[in-house]
Regions:
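Carbohydrate-interacting/catalytic domains
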Residues: 5, 19, 99-101, 108-125, ...
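Bacterial N-terminal signal peptides
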Residues: 7-16
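Immunoglobulin-like IPT/TIG beta-sandwich domains and homologous Ig-like subdomains
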Residues: 36-98
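Active-site-proximal helices and loops of the catalytic beta/alpha 8
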Residues: 223, 241, 246, 318, ...
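Hydrophobic faces of well-ordered beta-strands that scaffold small-molecule active sites
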Residues: 125-127, 183-185, 233-235, 329, ...
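Beta-strand/beta-sandwich contexts
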Residues: 20-51, 103, 107-111, 117
């Protein structure tokens, strides 16, 4: 009997000795030489890898440390890269007892120096689109085997519709003709979520484009072709949360990888109220709930206070800049992530890419609060977000309220716009604030209507004021919709983006008369705006509303653009003496678009 136990014990020891040790994934999949930060974090994932020792033998690369996490299927490997390390491939050797596993890793040369990456600014006009809803250029990737259950159904506004990167690439000439200079896509990374997650805001792989949109190489190719047309690409990223189907939830690296990790038994949702950031009397309870609560059950809240989570996210953003040559970042749900971590990320990014730009989604409608988030704001001192561009939800709120009012009294109609810009004294850099009249999370500016004069007036203001303007796909053809039914009704398919569509608004012949009028208006204004230093760099002078008219001027190096907006339903007369300091002795100006009716705008070059 003793012999049986001895044999059994020996067998168990043998099985333990040769238990599996696998590496399924290493993030990032490769890295670049010449980065300012010499530290490189590798997140190694595979069965039983957590107990392994690691060695590396490559000139200029040394092992700094390894970090074992609570799950035995993760191992964090920290390498130090010398300043003069050469591009090349080398082996990472993992050993545990008699077990040995070798994985090849590569360091690549950077395509250009960090200072050569130029971001977007006030000279640009951004065009926001949802890849799933713009155009389907490759129907073969609509259904991908092995992904979480989903359907492609264009009759369901909340399902996937099949749009992809190929569809965007095939219509780059459309954007060139329209005159936009930058495209911002909603997130394109893998969202392997039940139902399809067409919007892209529930990431399940930070290093992989969703195969229903295309591949990493196709994304890179699209950007190269956009650059050939002088069109920039802004990448939508999310540091605040990931998707619940991410491997980090299925096999949690550690309990502190997420905030409130016991979501199945004790779900904590964010309050969605961002006031604790600025409230001098806020309670810790309110601050924690806002910052650490989950958006929804399908979007786990990442803990950026964990230094390993932080480093993973920072490296990921740098990797996409280097790999795909993206021209800017739009950071989703910016204030919901840890403030100090985001500030440090921005500091690192600005040091590595000094001419780059990132816009943070700061959804607050008070100018003081929006300004609090901008880099070098005195309002947040001694803190500093280091975030160069914030989103002007105050402008969005005011223009969408003003459109339903007559400009007859103070604080009504266009007087709201005048007062909104009064608060520009709060911003360290008003010209680096991103303005918009609608986006993928709001009602369309037209609602369910088709008031073209109102749209023209708002768009004239958007494209000529002291801001970085952002348009939303389809506005140029008067796409409308409201969110009351669901988000899908403000994210409709672009007509003509699918083979067999009844209409094709991508061509003049496929648009109605009023759609062509709207498109031509945008085309004229956007192309006039390109390379216009008065718009990109000019100062601004605004006038109090007179007789329902709001007027302002942009000035730069002796050139002036003068804009007058009539905020009433009737023709109105305003004595030019009000604007004498701008008009001076000018006998005439050049009106690039002549529009003389109620609720319109006149632009004059002096």
């Amino acid at each position: 009997m003793k012999k049986v136990f001895l044999i059994l014990g020996t067998l168990l020891l043998s099985l333990s000795t040769y238990a599996a040790m696998n590496v399924n994934k290493i993030d990032p999949p490769f890295w670049y030489t010449g980065m300012q930060n010499p530290e490189l974090q590798l997140m190694v994932y595979g069965e039983g890898i957590g107990n392994a020792a690691v060695s590396v033998n490559y000139p200029g690369v040394s092992l700094s440390s390894t970090v074992k996490l609570e799950s035995n299927n993760y191992l964090l490997v920290y390498l130090k890269l010398d300043k003069d390390v050469k591009p090349g491939k080398f082996n990472l050797t993992f050993t545990e007892g008699k077990k040995k596993l070798v994985k090849e890793y590569e360091l690549k040369a950077r395509n250009k120096k960090g200072c050569e990456h130029k971001g977007f600014d006030a000279s640009d006009a951004l065009y926001l689109l949802m890849p799933d809803r713009f155009a389907n250029g490759n129907p073969d990737n609509d259904q991908i085997a092995g992904m979480a259950e989903y359907k492609v159904d264009r009759n369901d506004p909340n399902a996937r519709h099949g749009g992809d990167l190929a569809g965007i690439e095939q219509h780059l000439d459309y954007f060139s003709d329209l005159g936009v200079t930058a495209l911002w896509f909603t997130p394109v990374l893998e969202n392997n979520m039940t139902g399809g997650s067409y919007h892209g805001y529930a990431t399940t792989d930070y290093y992989k484009v969703d195969p229903r949109f295309g591949t990493n190489e196709e994304y890179k190719q699209l950007i190269e072709k956009a650059h050939a047309r002088d069109i920039k690409i802004v990448m939508d990223m999310i540091f605040n949360h990931c998707g619940v189907e991410h491997v980090w939830i299925k096999d949690m690296p550690s309990k502190d990888w997420f905030n409130n990790p016991d979501h199945e038994n004790n779900f904590v949702q964010t309050s969605f109220k961002l006031t604790p950031h600025v409230d001098p009397y806020t309670s810790q309870y309110d601050a924690d709930q806002m910052n650490d609560g989950w958006f929804v059950p399908s979007m786990p809240d990442l803990n950026q206070k964990n230094p390993h989570v932080y480093r993973y996210l920072v490296q990921n953003s740098f990797w996409w800049i280097e790999f795909a040559n993206i021209d800017g970042i739009r950071m989703d749900t910016y204030p919901y992530a840890d403030y100090d971590a985001m500030s440090n990320w921005m500091k690192e990014l600005n040091e590595e890419y000094p001419n780059y730009n990132t816009v943070g989604e700061t959804w607050v409608t008070e100018p003081a609060y929006t300004a609090w988030w901008q880099k070098d704001s005195k309002l947040s001192a001694p803190k500093n977000s280091n975030l160069k561009t914030v989103m002007d939800f105050s402008f969005f709120d005011k223009i969408n309220t003003a459109k339903n009012e007559q400009t007859e009294t103070w604080f009504k109609g266009l007087d709201r716009i005048y007062n909104n810009f009064v608060y520009d004294f709060l911003y360290p850099n008003p010209a680096s604030v991103l303005a918009f009249i609608e986006n993928h999370d709001t009602d369309r500016f037209l609602g369910e209507g088709n008031n073209l004069p109102m749209l023209k007036q708002a768009s004239t203001l958007l494209l000529t004021t002291r801001r970085i303007p952002q348009l939303y796909y389809g506005t140029e053809i008067m796409m409308n919709g409201v969110k009351s039914k669901s988000d899908g009704y403000v994210r409709k398919d672009f007509p003509g983006g699918w083979t067999g569509d009844a209409t094709n608004a991508l061509t003049p012949a496929g648009r109605t008369k009023i759609q062509n009028e709207c498109y031509d208006f945008y085309k004229t204004l956007l192309n006039w705006r390109k390379g216009n230093d008065v718009i990109a760099k000019g100062s601004m002078v605004q006038f109090m509303v007179q007789n329902g008219v709001y007027a302002y001027a942009r000035q730069y190096e002796g050139k002036t653009i003068f804009v007058m907006l009539n905020g009433t339903d009737a023709e109105t007369t305003v004595p030019l003496k009000f604007y004498k300091e701008i008009l001076k002795n000018s006998k005439q100006g050049k009106d690039i678009i002549i529009v003389i009716t109620a609720i319109t705008a006149i632009r004059i070059l002096l």
